[in-house]
Swiss-Prot record:
Binding site for Zn(2+): C83, C99, C106
Family membership noted in the UniProt record: Belongs to the PRA-CH family.
Provenance organism: Rhodospirillum centenum (strain ATCC 51521 / SW)
Catalytic activity annotation: 1-(5-phospho-beta-D-ribosyl)-5'-AMP + H2O = 1-(5-phospho-beta-D-ribosyl)-5-[(5-phospho-beta-D-ribosylamino)methylideneamino]imidazole-4-carboxamide
UniProt xrefs under InterPro entries: PRA-CH, PRib_AMP_CycHydrolase_dom, PRib_AMP_CycHydrolase_sf
Localization per Swiss-Prot or TrEMBL: Cytoplasm
Record-linked Gene3D superfamilies: 4.10.80.70, Phosphoribosyl-AMP cyclohydrolase (3.10.20.810)
Cofactor info, note text: Binds 1 Mg(2+) ion per subunit. Binds 1 zinc ion per subunit.
Cofactor: Mg(2+); Zn(2+)
A biological-process GO annotation: L-histidine biosynthetic process
Name the UniProt record assigns to this protein: Phosphoribosyl-AMP cyclohydrolase
Gene responsible for this protein: hisI
UniProt keyword annotations, A-Z: Amino-acid biosynthesis, Cytoplasm, Histidine biosynthesis, Hydrolase, Magnesium, Metal-binding, Zinc
Primary localization class, coarse: cytoplasm
Amino acid sequence: MTTAVLEALFAELRFDADGLVPAIAQQHDTGEVLMLAWMNRESIKETLAGGRVVYWSRSRRALWRKGDTSGQIQHLKELRLDCDGDALLLLVDQVGVACHTGRRNCFYRAVRDGTLAVIADVEVPAEELYGKG
């Protein structure tokens, strides 16, 4: 990725006051929405340079290399920006589960029939992902 392409991308993006933009991760071959996270210029550069998705952790205030702890990494297939430049869509190849709860994706709760229902089972217990428990 050339500096000119990065500069053009950053010129089109509208980062918030903290220098962040929301990024939706979607499984490239099935269309499954996996998660929402945040990216800054540094995480975008690293993701595009290496092909492995890197986010910005708002709680840790540091780069978050998805899967460093759990092994559940995301390989970038394509990065897209929306019409307003205020959100990214990352088409990824998810290795394992995307959610820290051990579910395939982070959208495992739904309002159905007037109740909040869990619609996806845990695939990998959190203690296996993170060695806690």
